[in-house]
């Protein structure tokens, strides 16, 4: 099974990559579960992680919420799971940089705007 959010750490920088390039990194409930797990891990690791970069794999940052997963009946663990995860990113003690390239719609824009710095191309 493909990881929906990849994490790589180098020189104190944790890079989180939304990893659904074939779907333009659309946000499914499963992706948010993985994203939150990484965010929780990073929040507790201020000794080793000094900065976070949030990016999308492929040609798009994020095309927004995955409407197909909603139509298929996939549900988040709670009604506020996505919003709570965005709030957790905003509250991280480390600065978070959104590396935005390509599409950045709806939920993807929420992700970008919760970061401390947004770099777009």
Q: Whereabouts are the PLM-identified features?
A:
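Hydrophobic/aromatic residues within transmembrane alpha-helices
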Residues: 16, 54, 66, 111-113
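Phosphate-coordinating loops and pocket residues in cytosolic domains that bind phosphorylated ligands
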Residues: 26-29, 63, 72, 114
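Glycine-rich beta-to-alpha active-site loop
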Residues: 88-121
